[in-house]
């Protein structure tokens, strides 16, 4: 027997909820560093824009879930929790970091 205290659940407060079979999943953290080429915002053709790559990756992660996995067999979620890159509004950065689970 085992008991878990959950911080994210739909169960009513003050009650004990249970179910038979699997009911939780693991969180597997990941971190990606995207390396591009910095350029001034007025000359985007001189850059390899890691921000655009990060946008596309975030969108495409959802395709993995909806098109590559049979969710009846293996429920899954991919979440992007943070995206960090750049320090100036008019400079395309050289590096962007993404993290999630």
Q: Predicted segments — roles?
A:
Residues 1-94:
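Histidine/acidic-residue-rich, glycine-tolerant segments that coordinate divalent metal ions
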